[in-house]
Every structure is written in structure tokens, then in C-alpha cells.
Amino acid sequence: VVDGPAIVLYMSHLGLGLVRALGREGVRVFALDPHRDALGMNSRYCTPVVTPDIKADEARYLDFLLEFGCARPSKPVLYPTGDPTVVLLSREREALSRYYHFVMP
């Protein structure tokens, strides 16, 4: 059983759907996106967090995720919603697993 919050990466239509589904179940959700006005960042079911842009600076994005995860009192679950985040999480899983749970194999 995971007691940490959910971290939804990128607020596309898929991200918004995840935020709503998790939030309606009482899960605390952080919505991460480089654009404050992205779809889903204003949902009542999440706390919006503006991040570096993974496409512009992947290393900075990874550093942000590591720092954000380290600051949580319990391990959050990462929900990637796009190819760039899936690729990064797959490649950097070992480093990120110190601070996060994963929903992907």
C-alpha cells in the first residue's frame, strides 16, 4: 500500500483525466508541468507545480524531480503521461526510485 501523494507529469488531456480520477478518490495529487496555464493545472483536485521544461533541459528537469521527491515526507507515485517523461523515468529509474514509486514496469 502506497500512502504518498501522486505526481502527474504533464497536464495534457491524459494528465487532467488522471488528476480528476485520483483526486476524486481522495488521493493528494501534484500536477507538474512547465506551463502554468496548461490544461489541468487549475483543477480543484491538484496542487499545481511549475517545472523546468524536459524538452529544453532534461538534466534540469531530472534535478527538479530528485529535489521535489526528496522534499516529500513519504514516497510519491510518479505518473508519466508522455513519451519524454516515460523515456526519462525508464533511463533514470534507479536514481528516482530513492524518492518515488513507479506505476510502470
Model features per residue range: what roles?
Residues 26-30:
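Hydrophobic anchor at the start of a short beta-strand
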Residues 31-46:
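Short, glycine/polar-rich helix-capping loops at beta-to-alpha or helix-loop-helix junctions
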Residues 2-6:
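Extreme N-terminal starter segment of soluble prokaryotic enzymes
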Residues 48-68:
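Glycine-rich, highly charged phosphate/nucleotide-binding loops
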Residues 7-20:
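Glycine-rich adenosine-cofactor-binding loop
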Residues 10, 33, 49-56, 105:
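Short beta->alpha connector loops at strand-helix junctions that form conserved
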